[in-house]
Amino acid sequence: GLNRVIVATGTSGVVLAKSNHIFTTDAYTLNGDITRQGTNISVVDGASGNILVASGTDYMGAIVDYSFESLVGSQRFGTVRVNFDSATAVMDETSTTDLNGNTDTVVFSVSVAGGNMTLSVANDIGSTIELVAVVNLIFRN
């Protein structure tokens, strides 16, 4: 297909289109086991934003490395891990110590509806946050 990753073979002038490394416009899939994608969202104060919506039939877990900064400079970096199926989801979060102010009122949550898991972030920090995340989705076998 036209969406394969091209790699050098070590032979001059020869390249190989890898069938187990697939790029789409938004994601990179490795060996049919892991999909990696990026997301960038702005969440105004007093609102929530969705970071990820994924099928519990297709995927069983997500690892989300994130960073965010508020418009007043408070920032945090961390990882959210989500274990889910088409009916239930649980999550945990680890993060750095805050910089330039408290970020305790920026809270991640997970829910399942219609077989899909949604990871969202609620912002009550007092200003808009800009969140950037790298999402690794693990396929269900």
Where are these regions (language model features)?
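Small-residue hinge/turn detector
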Residues: V5-A8
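Surface-exposed ligand/attachment interfaces on beta-rich extracellular proteins
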Residues: G13-V15, T35-G61, E69-Q75, T88, ...
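Broad, structure-driven detector of short, well-ordered beta-strand segments within folded domains
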Residues: H21, R76-F84, V106-V110
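Beta-strand elements of well-folded, non-transmembrane domains
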Residues: F68-S70, F84-S86, L137-F139
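Terminal beta-strand-rich extracellular "head" domains
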Residues: R81-T103
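C-terminal interaction-tip segments
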Residues: D124-N141
